[in-house]
Amino acid sequence: MLSYITWFFILIGFVTVTSYLVPVLLAAFKWGEQDLKAKYNAKWALVSGSSSGIGRAVAKKLAKQGLNVVLVALDDDALKGTYESLKKEFPNQQFRAVGCNLGKSDHEYDYMPIIKEATKDIDVQILVNNAGYIQLSAFFRSTLQKQLTNLECNMMSHVKITHHFLSNMVEKGLKGCITFTSSQSAFFPAPSCSSYGGGKAFLASFAASLAIECYTYGIDVLCLMSGPIQTNFYDNQPKLSFFKFFHAISDTPDSAADIMLNGVGRITWRDSSLFTIFSRLVVKIVDMNLLVQGIARGQSLSSDFKNHPELR
C-alpha cells in the first residue's frame, strides 16, 4: 500500500507535468491561426531583426493579414532586400525600413531616436521583439565590450523599444500585443554562450511579469522559447559538431513564426519545438543544481570541448 508521502510526490509530479503539457497539447491540436489585425483593430506592426529568419517570416505573415509593417534591422543589403521583396509581394501594404544597430548604444550613437522618428506618425500595436545573435566562446575569452554589445542587442534593445511603444499604447487606450523571441537557453544551462543564455532568461522573466501588468489594458504579452531554427544564426561561429545535431532537429522560420502568432493572447511562454519541450520536461524532473553539476563534469567528454579551446 502506498504511503501518504508517496502519494504526495505522485501528485506533485502529475500536477507539474500536466500543467505544462495541457497548454502544449492545446496549442498543437486546438489553437488555430489568429488574425491579429482584426483581434486588436491594428494597422501597424513593428518587427525587430526582420531582415532574415524568424523576423522576416513574422513580418511576411503580418503583412499577409493586412498589417503595415515597420522593419527594424541592421542597415545592410539583407534589410534592403527584405523591404523590396515585401513591397513587391504585398503592394497594398505599407512598409518602412529602419536601419540601425541595436547592439550599439552610447554617447555617440543611440538607435531609439531613429526608431522614434520613423514611427512618430503611426500607432504600433503589434510589437515583435525578435532581434538577437549568439556569440560562442567562454565568457572570459571574449572582451567585455563584445559581451555588453550582445546583451544590448538581445536584451536591452527589447526593453527600450517595448517601453516606448507600450507607453504609447496605454496612453492612447489601444489594444495590442508584444512578443519576445527567447530561447531554450533561457531555462537550460548554456555554457560557451553565457551572456546569450542570461539575456534570454531575462526576456522570459520580463515577459511573464509584463504580461500581468498589461492584462488590464488589453495588451497581450508572449515569449517564444525557440529551439534550433534553419537560419543563418550560426554563421561566422566555430564549426561545432553539435550544430549538425541542431540542424537535423531544427524548425523552419515559418513554423516558429506560426507558433508565435498563434499563441498570442492564449499563453505567455510558448515552447516552439520538440527539442524545447523535451528540455523543459528535463528541468521539471531534474533539479537545476544536479543538472549543472552533471553538465560541468561531463563536458570534457565532448569533442567540441576538446577541439575548440575558445569554448573553455
In which residue ranges do the predicted regions lie?
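Conserved mid-core segment of classical short-chain dehydrogenase/reductases
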Residues: 106-117, 126, 132-148, 192
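Residue(s) in the substrate-gating loop at a strand-loop-helix junction
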Residues: 183
